[in-house]
Amino acid sequence: MDVEKSTDRNIIISASADGLGWCMATFLLDQGHTVYLSDINQQKINEIRKHPLINKRIFIDYVDAGDSASVKKYFESISSKISSIDALINNVGIAGPTGPMEDLLIDEWQQTIDTNLNSHFYFTKYAIPLLKNNKGGSIINLSSTAGLFGFPLRTPYAASKWAVIGLTKSLAMELGEFDIRVNAICPGSVSGDRIDRVIKAKAKSLGINEKEVKEDFEAMASLKMFVDKEDIANMAVFLLSNEAQRISGQVMTVDGNTERMN
């Protein structure tokens, strides 16, 4: 994305050893920034530790983002290296279960809320002092178009994503006086393994074939297509740039104009 480059910023990205998180990290590395990454997938972490920029402009650790003690330990490690950060991207998220509410397991609900919502709280809680030390900065929360519509058979996921938008709006008001901007990105259906798993689960739940489900997902957006992780990464780069310095409390959709979710 052709935005003004502001090099040498310290940026924390959760769930960033693979997929969208790693895509955002690579875009930001190209901008000249230093990224502090974390993930629960040790195999992917080990792969990134072979990168030529490791311990120079890439730092990565194992973190269970849904566990407050794990997140606290991670931030203690970061604080031993640097005293401030410029930005936090809360990227952790899972698809959660698919099915009627009465059939869902309590543990499935709790895992979805812990991962998709509580992780944002934990990371943000410990990031705020580092952002204040920086005299300002930016927080990006990854929500979803499921946080803008009702989403039958995906209630835990939708509830968690609506909550992320509430978190974003409230924090933007709370942190504005410290020159900390807070925005949410709402991706639509993003091409990749996660949407493939969702399609498979929904097809099984409804007793129809996966091709039908995929076509219906595509039809939910005016542009009749899925988005790519690079589209989301471009939006993140923009929101962290100087060009977005007056944008806060906003919900930015990157979804091909979702018209419905069902």
Residue ranges of each PLM-predicted region?
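Short C-terminal tail/terminal secondary-structure segment
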Residues: 2, 95-98, 149, 237, ...
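Residue(s) in the substrate-gating loop at a strand-loop-helix junction
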Residues: 144
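Substrate-binding pocket helix/loop in short-chain dehydrogenase/reductase
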Residues: 99-101, 108-113, 217
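Short, small/polar-rich loop/turn modules that mediate ligand/substrate recognition or access, typified
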Residues: 176, 181, 247-249
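Active-site helix of classical SDR
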Residues: 124, 160, 168
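Canonical Rossmann dinucleotide-binding motif of NAD(H)/NADP(H)-dependent dehydrogenases/reductases
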Residues: 3-36
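C-terminal helical subdomain
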Residues: 184, 208-243, 247, 254-256
